[in-house]
């Protein structure tokens, strides 16, 4: 597996753990497998890799939690996904295609490029009153409520 593919895969798993953690009390490998449509053995291999990289912890019950580094990476990836998806939808791209394209683009953008895209996106008229802006705030608020974590 190439470095890019490994990086993209890791970011997708971390993003999935964050999404699940925002909607349920505990995250297990089976939850990730169901969300992504992957086999449980594939997810288990990925979780082992993420644990070795210091991105997640797995307790005795098999519950998965993001470490500080994992949370930062997951938040960054998810924020890119939300901003890019909604920017593309505002440009007239269908929601499905926008989500698929955002998932591919989010892994290759430099931090500088993403910040400029986000700045432009946040200047759109009425954005602060929109559901998509509220989703960004939810990400920020969730990350700040995780013990030991700060945005």
Residue map of PLM features:
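N-terminal helix-turn-helix DNA-binding core of bacterial DNA-binding proteins
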Residues: 4-38
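The short coil/loop that forms the "turn" connecting the two helices of the helix-turn-helix
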Residues: 37-38, 61, 93
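Key DNA-contact positions within bacterial/archaeal DNA-binding proteins
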Residues: 41, 96
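Alpha-helical DNA-recognition elements
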Residues: 49, 104
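Glycine-centered, phosphate/nucleic-acid-interacting loop/turn motifs that mediate DNA/RNA or nucleotide
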Residues: 54
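Basic, amphipathic "hinge/linker" alpha-helix immediately C-terminal to the N-terminal HTH DNA-binding motif
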Residues: 62-80
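C-terminal regulatory/oligomerization modules of transcriptional regulators
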Residues: 106-151
């Amino acid at each position: 597996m190439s470095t890019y593919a490994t990086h993209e895969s890791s970011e997708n798993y971390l993003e999935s753990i964050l999404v699940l953690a925002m909607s349920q009390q505990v995250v297990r490998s089976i939850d990730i497998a169901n969300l992504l449509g992957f086999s449980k053995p594939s997810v288990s291999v990925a979780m082992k890799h993420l644990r070795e990289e210091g991105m997640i912890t797995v307790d005795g019950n098999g519950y998965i939690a993001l470490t500080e580094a994992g949370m930062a990476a997951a938040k960054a990836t998810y924020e890119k996904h939300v901003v890019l998806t909604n920017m593309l939808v505002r440009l007239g791209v269908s929601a499905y295609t926008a989500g698929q394209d955002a998932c591919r683009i989010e892994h290759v953008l430099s931090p500088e490029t993403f910040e400029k895209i986000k700045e432009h996106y946040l200047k759109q008229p009425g954005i602060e009153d929109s559901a998509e802006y509220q989703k960004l705030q939810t990400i920020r608020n969730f990350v700040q409520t995780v013990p030991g974590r700060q945005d």
